[in-house]
């Protein structure tokens, strides 16, 4: 667990089950999960409100660890309330603008803000993610002014990817914190 920042875990549509790397990180590193009232029928307004409450409840600056739909949540949040966010680690950003890639219930998060984030960020993508084309994920990273890593063919980088606690991902997250001078 970092001592200079609070780390908030932001799952995407459907939440992250017990074998998802986000759940492992929460258990193993003491990070906090931002809970949503409805994981299966999200509304941008409700999710933004819950994220804002979670950020405001922290006594320190915050680093966000987002997966899938929650990456769009972070981009929207950055448009209005970024002051306590010190960085974001964005994994498998779902392309909520694509009917081919994303279910209807997630499209209420579009359009995806494509302006530079006001805090350092890093996007991690897979070369065969069914919810975002690899080049589109890199486009998001470039638009947001974020670093970018393609970890190869690991699907949606979730429990089905077979990564377990994904120690390589956590090492990359820690390296980002150090690079951002937050570790």
Annotate the PLM regions.
Residues 159-175:
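Post-His helix in hydrolase/transferase enzymes
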Residues 32, 142-158:
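Catalytic histidine neighborhood in serine/cysteine hydrolases
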Residues 117-118, 122-125, 129:
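Short beta-strand/loop motif that positions the catalytic acidic residue
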Residues 15-16, 127-132:
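Acidic catalytic loop of the alpha/beta-hydrolase fold
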Residues 83-98:
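A conserved short beta-strand
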Residues 64-75:
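Gly/Ala-rich beta-loop-alpha elbow adjacent to hydrolase catalytic centers
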Residues 22, 133-141:
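Short alpha-helix in the alpha/beta-hydrolase fold that links the catalytic acid
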Residues 2-60, 180:
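Active-site catalytic motif of lipid deacylating hydrolases and related acyltransferases
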